UniProtKB/Swiss-Prot annotation:
E.C. designation(s): 2.7.7.6
Family: Belongs to the RNA polymerase alpha chain family.
The encoding gene: rpoA
GO CC terms in record: cytoplasm; DNA-directed RNA polymerase complex
Protein task: DNA-dependent RNA polymerase catalyzes the transcription of DNA into RNA using the four ribonucleoside triphosphates as substrates.
Protein name: DNA-directed RNA polymerase subunit alpha
Reaction catalysed by this enzyme: RNA(n) + a ribonucleoside 5'-triphosphate = RNA(n+1) + diphosphate
Region: Alpha C-terminal domain (alpha-CTD), residue numbers: 252-328
Superkingdom field: Bacteria
Alpha N-terminal domain (alpha-NTD), as annotated region: 1-231
Upper taxonomic lineage: Bacteria, Pseudomonadati, Chlorobiota, Chlorobiia, Chlorobiales
Cross-referenced SMART domains: RPOLD
C-alpha cells in the first residue's frame, strides 16, 4: 500500500537575502527525517556534480617543472598556481581552450588579464592577484581552460600529448562556493514533529542560486528515477494502483470536508456540535471522545450516535487528518 506523505506545496525563497550570488530556500513541511535526507542530498550534488569552468594547466616560457622560480617575477610557480586555482569563469565553451598571454613589467598580473582568444569565456573575479612582474621583465604564459564537474586532481588533467613544460593544475570546476543545511521542527495542525529544511546556497556568479538548485534537483531526479521504475514483479506498483491510491486519498479528503449538517443526526447532537464550532466531519474525527464529553449538553447518548455515524464511513475519533488538509 502507498501512503500519502506530507510534502511542501512549493519551495519558498527568502527575498530579503536573495542576490545573484546567494539564495536561501525553505522547504516545509517534511516528514520527520526527510529534512536531513533531502538537505544532505542537495548539498552533495550542489558541491560535487554541477558543471563549471576552471584552469586545468599552464605553460610558462623558461619553466620546466612546477617548483621553479621565474626570473623577473616576484612569486614562484607554486604560488602562481595557487592563485590561478581561484580564478572563476562564466563560459560557453564545451571543450578545452588555450589562451596565450604576454605580461610586460612593471605589472600587477591579475585574473582580468586572462582574456579568451575567441571569446569562449569571461573572468568573473577580474581583480584577483596572480603575480607581480618586475620592471624590464616579461612573463609569457599559456593558460589552458577546461570544462568539467566538481573537482579534478592535477594528475587527471595531464593530456596524452603533453607539451614540454606543461604544468597540470587541480581544477575546481564547481560554481558553488558554499552550501549550508539547517533542519528545524515545524507545526502542521496539532503536530509539531514535522521538519523545515533551510538551504543556503552561495555561488561564484557563473550560475544563479535558483538555477543551481533546479539543476541539482534534476540530477537527483534522474538518478532516483531508476528506483522509481524498478519493480520486483510485474503485478506490483502498477500505474493503476498509483491512480487508485490517489483516488482514495481525494475521496477521503472530500469526505472529511463534508459538512456536519449533511449527516443524519438528531437536533440535539447538531446543536451541540454547532456550539462547539465543529463544522465538518474532519473537525469531528480530529477530536477525542473525552474532549467531546466536556462540551455543554453533550452526553454519552450523543457520543454513541456520532460513533455510529462515523463507523458507516470507517472513521473514528482521535484521527490524525493533517495529511489530508489543503496546503496554502
Amino acid at each position: 500500500m502507498i501512503y500519502q506523505m506530507q510534502m511542501p506545496a512549493k519551495i519558498e525563497v527568502d527575498e530579503t537575502t536573495h542576490t545573484d550570488y546567494f539564495g536561501r530556500f525553505v522547504a516545509q513541511p517534511l516528514e520527520r527525517g526527510y529534512g536531513v535526507t533531502l538537505g544532505n542530498m542537495m548539498r552533495r550534488v550542489l558541491l560535487a556534480s554541477l558543471p563549471g569552468t576552471a584552469i586545468t594547466g599552464i605553460k610558462v616560457d623558461g619553466v620546466f617543472h612546477e617548483f621553479s622560480a621565474i626570473e623577473g617575477v616576484r612569486e614562484d610557480v607554486p604560488e602562481i598556481v595557487l592563485n590561478l586555482k581561484k580564478v572563476r569563469f562564466r563560459s560557453t565553451c564545451k571543450r578545452s581552450c588555450k589562451t596565450t598571454l604576454t605580461i610586460t613589467g612593471p605589472k600587477d598580473f591579475t585574473a582580468g588579464d586572462i582574456v579568451a582568444m575567441e571569446g569562449e569565456f569571461d573572468v568573473l573575479n577580474k581583480d584577483l592577484h596572480i603575480a607581480t612582474v618586475n620592471e624590464g621583465s616579461t612573463l609569457n604564459i599559456d593558460v589552458f581552460v577546461g570544462r568539467g564537474r566538481g573537482y579534478t586532481p592535477a594528475e587527471d588533467n595531464r593530456p596524452e600529448s603533453m607539451p614540454i613544460g606543461y604544468i597540470a593544475i587541480d581544477a575546481i570546476y564547481t560554481p558553488i562556493r558554499n552550501v549550508k543545511v539547517a533542519v528545524e521542527n515545524t507545526r502542521v495542525g496539532q503536530r509539531t514533529d514535522y521538519e523545515k529544511m533551510v538551504l543556503d546556497v552561495e555561488t561564484d556568479g557563473s550560475i544563479t542560486p535558483d538555477d543551481s538548485i533546479s539543476l541539482a534537483g534534476r540530477i537527483i531526479n534522474e538518478h532516483v528515477a531508476f528506483f522509481a521504475d524498478f519493480s520486483p514483479t510485474e503485478e506490483e506498483f502498477t500505474e493503476e494502483e498509483f491512480k487508485q491510491q490517489d483516488d482514495e486519498f481525494e475521496a477521503m479528503r472530500k469526505l472529511l470536508n463534508t459538512k456536519i449538517e449533511d449527516l443524519d443526526l438528531s437536533v440535539r447532537s447538531h446543536n451541540c456540535l454547532r456550539l462547539a464550532e465543529i463544522d465538518s466531519i474532519g473537525d469531528l474525527v480530529s477530536r477525542k471522545e473525552d474532549e467531546l464529553l466536556n462540551y455543554k449538553n453533550f452526553g454519552k447518548k450523543s457520543l454513541t450516535e456520532l460513533k455510529e455515524q462515523l463507523e458507516k464511513f470507517e472513521l473514528k475519533f482521535g484521527m490524525d487528518i493533517t495529511k489530508y488538509q489543503m496546503k496554502g
